[in-house]
Amino acid sequence: MKRWVKVWEKFIEEKIREIRETVGDSKAIIALSGGVDSSTAAVLAHRAIGDRLHAVFVNTGFLRKGEPEFVIKTFRDEFGMNLHYVDAQDRFFAALKGVTDPEEKRKIIGRVFIEVFEEVAKDIGAEYLIQGTIAPDWIESQGKIKSHHNVGGLPEKLNLKIIEPLRDLYKDEVRQLAKELGLPEKIYNRMPFPGPGLAVRVIGEVTPEKIRIVREANAIVEEEIEKAGLRPWQAFAVLLGVKTVGVQGDIRAYKETIAVRIVESVDGMTANAMNVPWEVLQRIAFRITSEIPEVGRVLYDITNKPPATIEFE
């Protein structure tokens, strides 16, 4: 254990030095989402350059339930960071109007993210963009499995210089580093959440109404998994964009279908569908169909990775 502590201490020292040397007397912004990757990168960068780091939290409209409040409270109030909150929901929805291809979605989201970051950077005079990119992000992007909004989704021409202090780490290593940096468990044990957010948990075109449905379903899945004391790698809901026939009283119903995905993994590179107790799945299905009037059917995805990826898009 002591050996690993020393390894992380050395890693932290090296990364702090690298960030300081790279940024110099300039300012930097960091793309902060509240997930473990960007949070760890933010704390590392904050130690390196202090108030010259400006954390930018963009509300895309594709966030989990309660996410904006959680991020603002944690990083502005508890960590004392310079936090810039940007409400860009209308901008992202407009950019994705009519788009159904998942790769196109990711690239558009990456482009709009960068546009927002460049605007904030210009306002504060920052030259650098720090990102929480980790190894699986660029491995999947290079392998053309899927573009990650912070790698394959980035435009070719950037006005900001990119710094990626975590790019050689895997998720389990980032969690260890976060713990070593003193981040609370509510951060370092958070389930991974895709950079494009709920936009890639809606199959087909993204609309505010569809996002509202999948956000509520996702919250129910997370709540029930936590109540059951289960610790999966990821647990979430996907709106399939397929309506099926059901019965409501004595009347025919034609409603949306939600898929539930719960997997176990160590680093996200491979994953197994979790053998969730039947009563937990039943509770999830009951709550989703009872609390979200638009949903009439809930399915459980039992596919491993490979052949499937963890996220549907």
Swiss-Prot record:
Signal peptide: none annotated. Residues 6-190 form the GMPS ATP-PPase domain. The keyword Nucleotide-binding applies. Pathway: Purine metabolism; GMP biosynthesis; GMP from XMP (L-Gln route): step 1/1. GO terms for molecular function: ATP binding; GMP synthase activity. It is an enzyme of class 6 (ligase). Heterodimer composed of a glutamine amidotransferase subunit (A) and a GMP-binding subunit (B). This is GMP synthase [glutamine-hydrolyzing] subunit B. It comes from Pyrococcus furiosus (strain ATCC 43587 / DSM 3638 / JCM 8422 / Vc1). The gene is guaAB.
